[in-house]
């Protein structure tokens, strides 16, 4: 069993569950930080539910609980987020929600984790951006703008932390192969999409000591799309 401790935000979503399982399979100690409550986590996982990561104080409290429980934190995996398709003539509610769910959660969790991550010999932050943010399509304005902001947060924070042991990177997936996406796009071949477990494997590499040479990277994980 590794001594490394990872905190996974949004750990009860489709991707979050895949990341948690990959971390457990790698022998890591895992904490799940999620807005949901009453969820069942795998054995040995520290479950911290009911956390609104758009609130900086709640984010700090959750990270403090992880450190109090395990005595350390080595990697923060910012999986929490959301998606909406909405055109710009009615975008305001979606705009605010996407920036809150995708950007503010990552910012607050990262700020809360900086002290313990700097104390780790191999501190890691991994964010989830989006390949769609590189060239937005119709109805994707709010979502891709928020993910573009995640990309820039990743690059900026990586520069700020270059003198420390902490690396900051982001994965940029295309379409994830989920039940919801299959239902929404029944005429598209899902074999070309990205399996959550495959994306989780890339995230776990970036979160590992082996990823020490990479920081500020925006890593496309696009399958065959």
What are these regions (language model features)?
Residues 12:
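Conserved glycine-rich cofactor-binding loop
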Residues 82-97, 119, 139-142, 182:
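Conserved mid-core segment of classical short-chain dehydrogenase/reductases
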Residues 110, 146:
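Active-site helix of classical SDR
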Residues 115, 159-163:
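Alpha-helical segment proximal to the catalytic Tyr-Lys
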Residues 130:
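Residue(s) in the substrate-gating loop at a strand-loop-helix junction
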Residues 135-141, 163, 192:
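Active-site loop immediately N-terminal to the catalytic Tyr-X3-Lys motif
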Residues 163-166, 170-171, 178, 187-225:
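C-terminal helical subdomain
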